A protein has these predicted regions:
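Extended two-metal-dependent nuclease catalytic cores across DNA- and RNA-processing enzymes
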Residues: 1-171
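Low-complexity, acidic/Ser/Thr- and charged residue-rich accessory regions of DNA metabolism proteins
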Residues: 150, 160-231
Length: 231
C-alpha cells in the first residue's frame, strides 16, 4: 500500500531530476528494461543494467552487461562468459531454467521445492533444459525424482515467471535518454516539502535558500499537502 501512494511522488521527483520514466501498462519493469536494452544494442550502444537480480543474466550479450553490486562493496560487470562461469551454465539463457528450478524469493519465483542452486545446476548440466528434464524424469532417482514429478506445473510456472520479455511495445529514443542537469527550481521545493534535508544540501545555494516560507505554508494548509499524494 505504501509504495502505491508513493509512486506519484516518485514520478514528480524523477521529472524534476530530468530522469526519464519508461513504463508500459500491463508489463513489468524487467520487461521494459529487457526490451530497451536489446533495442539499444541493435542501434550500436553498449548497455549496462544496474541490478542485483539474477534473472537479468538471461539478457546479457556481447554488448549488454549486468552491473551487479557486490555484498562487499563495489560492482561486478557480468557478460555472457561471467554469467555462465558464475552459475555453471553452458549459455546465459539457461538462467531462466535455473531460476525455474531453484526459484528466487526476491522475485517471488517459487521454483521446485527441495531443489536448491547446486542441484538445479547439476540437473541443467545433465539435461540442458527444463523441457529435457521433464521428459526424462525416469532417469532421476529417489526423492529428487519424486520432487520433480510432483511439481511439474510449479516448475513450468516458475520458468514463465523467470522469463524477461524483450518485445514490449515501446520505442527506444536515445535522444530522450541523454543526461540533463536537475531542475532545482522544481526539485528543491519537493525536497523541502518531503523533508529530504540531506538531499536539499546538494541544491545550489540560491535555490536552497529560496522560498523560506514553504514550511509555514505547508502547516497552514495541511489538507492540501495531503491531497497531493492522491493526485
Amino acid at each position: 500500500e505504501d509504495i502505491r501512494w508513493a509512486v506519484p511522488r516518485i514520478k514528480q521527483i524523477l521529472k524534476a531530476m530530468n530522469v526519464p520514466v519508461l513504463q508500459v501498462d500491463g508489463y513489468e519493469a524487467d520487461d521494459v528494461i529487457g526490451t530497451i536494452a536489446h533495442k539499444a544494442e541493435k542501434e550500436g550502444f553498449e548497455v549496462y543494467m544496474a541490478t542485483p537480480d539474477k534473472d537479468y543474466g538471461q539478457l546479457v550479450t556481447e554488448h549488454v552487461f549486468m552491473y551487479r553490486p557486490r555484498h562487499t562493496g563495489g560492482f561486478e560487470k557480468l557478460g555472457p562468459q561471467e554469467v555462465c562461469e558464475k552459475y555453471g551454465l553452458q549459455n546465459q539463457l539457461q538462467v531462466i531454467d535455473l531460476l525455474g528450478l531453484m526459484g528466487d524469493s526476491s522475485d517471488n519465483i517459487p521454483g521446485c521445492k527441495g531443489v536448491g542452486e547446486k542441484t538445479a545446476i547439476q540437473l541443467l548440466q545433465q539435461f540442458g533444459s527444463i523441457d529435457n528434464l521433464l521428459a526424462s524424469t525416469d532417469q532421476l532417482k529417489g526423492a529428487l525424482q519424486r520432487k520433480v514429478q510432483e511439481q511439474v506445473e510449479e516448475i513450468r510456472f516458475s520458468r514463465f515467471l523467470a522469463t524477461i520479455k524483450t518485445d514490449v511495445p515501446i520505442e527506444f529514443d536515445a535522444q530522450s535518454l541523454i543526461y540533463q542537469e536537475r531542475d532545482w527550481e522544481q526539485l528543491a521545493p519537493l525536497y523541502r516539502e518531503l523533508e529530504f534535508n540531506s538531499l536539499l544540501k546538494q541544491a545550489p545555494t540560491l535555490v536552497a535558500n529560496s522560498q523560506v516560507s514553504s514550511k509555514s505554508t505547508k502547516k497552514a494548509k495541511p489538507q492540501e499537502a495531503t491531497l497531493d499524494l492522491f493526485a
